[in-house]
Amino acid sequence: MEQYTKAEILIEALPYICKFHDQKFLIKYGGHAMVNEQARNWIAKDLVLLKYVGINPIVVHGGGPEINRAMEKMGKTPEFIHGLRVTDEETLEIVKMVLIGKINGDIVSKLERYGGKAVGLSGKSGQLIKAKKKIQYLMKDSQKIEIDLGMVGEVEHVDTKLIDILVEKRYIPVISPIGVDHQGNDLNLNADIAAGDIAGAMNAEKLIMVTDVDGIMDDINDQSTLHRRLTISQIEDMIEKGFITGGMIPKIEACINALDKGVQSVHIVNGKTPHAVLLEIFTEEGVGTMIVKE
């Protein structure tokens, strides 16, 4: 690459670096985006660079594929209802083992390998996430039926004090989505929804969903149908028309929730795209879908 071209790329990023200096970005790092070593390296480098140019990334991670593999090794079949994992006591122990015991530490190690300072947390750390058991409903024969998801929670309250301290001390917090109820019971939280709640509580400027798709598309197999910018009302219309289904629905609920709580924009990007986070933030066109309130 010619030297002047490199300079042009850096200069294109300058107004965004100025605009977002000292802002908080919540990065939801999906399990499906952790597909290979190269993709994990790209994400880690992007987050460390953000920190060094004065932006404060806060990571909430998932781990669905690894949890599924661990469950299958132990003879359990993963079960989902509307994109939420049905979680009995044994499944919860597997979830905690994979999220807190493995994935969280792996992400912290990657960030530190590339020059960042990172601290692994869960929602249990410093009473970070207070949760309650989630009640899920399904419609059957025009009747609303309550479904028991087991030890699945929803966020009641996020105490940001610990995250604030770490951010001020130049650390990148890395959070596993396990919450605690008022009786001290652990609850499995959907990582997308937890990320939206934490982003709102932190007054984050952006919520960036790093997943395994390029963004929101009319046809998942046709890159030309990718939407670069959508509003909440447009998103709701797409759900009604069946363009958004399954595991994407909790992601969209998290996006809308974050925007309702004051986050300025939400971005969905593909972690398999080299340096997708940097390209989405620091270029005019971006590489994914940006969602705004209106």
UniProtKB/Swiss-Prot annotation:
<dbReference type="Pfam" id="PF00696">
    <property type="entry name" value="AA_kinase"/>
</dbReference>
<feature type="site" description="Transition state stabilizer">
    <location>
        <position position="251"/>
    </location>
</feature>
<keyword id="KW-0808">Transferase</keyword>
<dbReference type="GO" id="GO:0005737">
    <property type="term" value="C:cytoplasm"/>
</dbReference>
<dbReference type="GO" id="GO:0003991">
    <property type="term" value="F:acetylglutamate kinase activity"/>
</dbReference>
<dbReference type="InterPro" id="IPR041727">
    <property type="entry name" value="NAGK-C"/>
</dbReference>
<dbReference type="GO" id="GO:0005524">
    <property type="term" value="F:ATP binding"/>
</dbReference>
<protein>
    <recommendedName>
        <fullName>Acetylglutamate kinase</fullName>
        <ecNumber>2.7.2.8</ecNumber>
    </recommendedName>
</protein>
<dbReference type="GO" id="GO:0042450">
    <property type="term" value="P:arginine biosynthetic process via ornithine"/>
</dbReference>
<keyword id="KW-0028">Amino-acid biosynthesis</keyword>
<dbReference type="InterPro" id="IPR036393">
    <property type="entry name" value="AceGlu_kinase-like_sf"/>
</dbReference>
<keyword id="KW-0547">Nucleotide-binding</keyword>
<dbReference type="InterPro" id="IPR001048">
    <property type="entry name" value="Asp/Glu/Uridylate_kinase"/>
</dbReference>
<comment type="pathway">
    <text>Amino-acid biosynthesis; L-arginine biosynthesis; N(2)-acetyl-L-ornithine from L-glutamate: step 2/4.</text>
</comment>
<keyword id="KW-0055">Arginine biosynthesis</keyword>
<feature type="binding site">
    <location>
        <position position="188"/>
    </location>
    <ligand>
        <name>substrate</name>
    </ligand>
</feature>
<dbReference type="InterPro" id="IPR037528">
    <property type="entry name" value="ArgB"/>
</dbReference>
<comment type="similarity">
    <text>Belongs to the acetylglutamate kinase family. ArgB subfamily.</text>
</comment>
<keyword id="KW-0963">Cytoplasm</keyword>
<feature type="binding site">
    <location>
        <position position="85"/>
    </location>
    <ligand>
        <name>substrate</name>
    </ligand>
</feature>
<dbReference type="GO" id="GO:0006526">
    <property type="term" value="P:L-arginine biosynthetic process"/>
</dbReference>
<dbReference type="InterPro" id="IPR001057">
    <property type="entry name" value="Glu/AcGlu_kinase"/>
</dbReference>
<comment type="function">
    <text>Catalyzes the ATP-dependent phosphorylation of N-acetyl-L-glutamate.</text>
</comment>
<keyword id="KW-0067">ATP-binding</keyword>
<feature type="binding site">
    <location>
        <begin position="63"/>
        <end position="64"/>
    </location>
    <ligand>
        <name>substrate</name>
    </ligand>
</feature>
<feature type="site" description="Transition state stabilizer">
    <location>
        <position position="28"/>
    </location>
</feature>
<dbReference type="InterPro" id="IPR004662">
    <property type="entry name" value="AcgluKinase_fam"/>
</dbReference>
<keyword id="KW-0418">Kinase</keyword>
